[in-house]
Every structure is written in C-alpha cells, then in structure tokens.
Amino acid sequence: MTRATFTILLLAACVGLRPAAAAEVRVVSQTVGTDELLLAVAAPEQIAALSHLARDPVFSGVAQAAEAYPMIGMGDAETILRYRPTLVLFSDYSRIELVEQVRRSGVQVLIFNRYESLDDAYANLRQLAAALGDDTARDRAETVIADCRARLAELHRRLQGVKPVRVIAPSTYGVIAGSETTFQDICDQAGAENLAVTLGHLTGHAAPPSEAMLKWPVEVLVLGGANRDEALAPFLKLPPYAFMAAVREGRTALLDAWALGCVTHLRVHAYEQLARQLHPERWQKDGP
C-alpha cells in the first residue's frame, strides 16, 4: 500500500467516524461546469470547495461568486477528502482514477455526462438539486430554469425571421468546432450558421479542412476574450485563417472567454452576447 493510498483511506475513515449531522451536506466540485451548477442551486453552507479554475474568468462564469469559497487546487483525492465532503461532483472528462479513489472512500459521487444543449443543462440542475435532497435546492433549480426559458423566449422573439450570419469559431489548437458542440448550440440560438457544419460537415472538435476553408464565405469570426485585437492577433499569421478576408478585415464577434465553451445554463449569456453582435438591428429600438 502506497503512502498516498494509506492517507486517502485514513481520511475516509475519519470522515466516516464523524458524528452524523441530520441534514449536513458538504459538496466539493471538481470541474468548472459543476462549479456553475453548484453555485446555482446549493446553499452557501453546503459548498465545501470548488474547482481549481473556479475563480479564473477565462474559464469560469462564476469567477466573482467563487471568491467566497475554498478551491481544491489540482484536486487529488487526498485534497478532496480533506474537505470532508458528503458529495463530490465530477464530469465524464474527470480523471477516472480520481473518481474511483473518491468513490472507494465511501463518499457519494455524481458524474455529469450530458451538456450539449440547454435541455441537458436543465436536467443537470435538477439532478444536482435532487442529490442535495432538499426542496429549497429544487426550487432554486426551477427558478434558474424559468429565468433561462424566459430569456430564450425573448431572444427568439427578437430574432424571428433573421437571416443567419455565416460564422466559424477558429482555434489555435488545430481544431474547429463542428456539430455536437457547445459552439453549435450557441449558433443555433443566436441566428448564426456554423460553416464548419454546413460546408465542412465536421462533427465535434475536428481538424479544419484548411484548403477548402479558403472558399468558405465566412462573414464573421466568433472569438473568445476580453480584447478584440488580442483575440484576433494569433489568426493574422496562422494558416489558413490568415488568408481569409474576414480575418484580414477584422470581422469578429467577441464573446466572454468562458462563454464560448460553457457547458451549463450560463450559456444563455453566450446566446444573447452573440445575437446582439450579429443582429444589432433587433435591439436598436431599445436605445443605448
């Protein structure tokens, strides 16, 4: 038995020996997505710790709210168990060995594996609320869902009849977002046509067809970041994007960095943010 394994078992035993509190719930979140879900439905006293990226606005849509809570660092099992959790939240991209170590300690784990659409996000909110086991959490989940639905209905009302703007979401990592991605979901709701799907026929995050892309009629690049020039800069010298008119002319829509890959209900913000930039005329009557 390794020293790390012994420590994990000892911590698990200590957790098990603690006097049971009737309604005590202590939740540790291991990913940014589960941070966002947890902060939406849990009471503050139920949140034991959040992920190591919880306060990073590049990745987290709850960076400011997360400042009130501890973070688990890189979050090995020993660190997670030190927060004496009764429930640990993982995603299906969490390390399998980490999930199993926590599970073997006797702590309940909840793994989220669907986040392609807003309906998936609603289901995840309800699943977490049910795991927390109190009516207040369920009420919070339903309130969040109702708010998202109202905002989405208003967005659809404004965008009714618009001609979709032809877009792509370029990446410096050698892939581009196709169908079955959060970016495609954003496009579907924001009045955008993702050319990686309609012309490239790509699924997931796939290698871009570099030569063929040069013929795509890209109207707008969708980028993530806080500064338009900084977000565009890498693509000015990166083939094939450097040869596209949209890149040379700086035709961009800028989303908050975290919003571009958001896997929770907070993606409604991305829908609204992109729609306002692609179809500003639908908001002109509102004034400044």
Q: Over which residues does each language-model region extend?
A:
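Bacterial N-terminal signal peptides
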Residues: 5-16
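Sec/Tat signal peptide C-region and signal peptidase I cleavage site
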Residues: 17-22
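Short secondary-structure boundary segments
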Residues: 31, 51, 92-93, 114, ...
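Short helices/loops that flank or line small-molecule/ion binding pockets
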Residues: 77-84, 207-217
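A ligand-binding cleft/hinge motif common to bilobed small-molecule-binding domains
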Residues: 94-104, 220-238
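His/Asp/Glu-enriched short active-site or ligand-binding loop at hydrolase and phosphoryl-transfer sites
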Residues: 182-205, 225, 253-254
